[in-house]
Swiss-Prot record:
One of its GO terms (biological process) is defense response to Gram-positive bacterium. Optimum pH is about 6. Activity decreases sharply with increasing alkalinity. Has antibacterial activity against L.monocytogenes. Antimicrobial activity was completely lost after treatment with proteinase k, or high concentrations of chymotrypsin, trypsin or pepsin. Also inhibited by isopropanol, methanol, acetonitrile and chloroform. There was no significant loss of activity with either lipase, peroxidase, or amylase. Its main location: secreted. Disulfide bonds: none annotated. It is found in: Secreted. Optimum temperature is 30 degrees Celsius. Active from 30 to 100 degrees Celsius. It comes from Limosilactobacillus mucosae (Lactobacillus mucosae). This is Antibacterial peptide AN1. GO terms for cellular component: extracellular region. Keywords: Antibiotic, Antimicrobial, Secreted.
């Protein structure tokens, strides 16, 4: 999964 990783990085 990368949703969490992307969300965190986006923040």
């Amino acid at each position: 999964l990368v949703a969490l990783d992307t969300e965190f990085a986006n923040r």
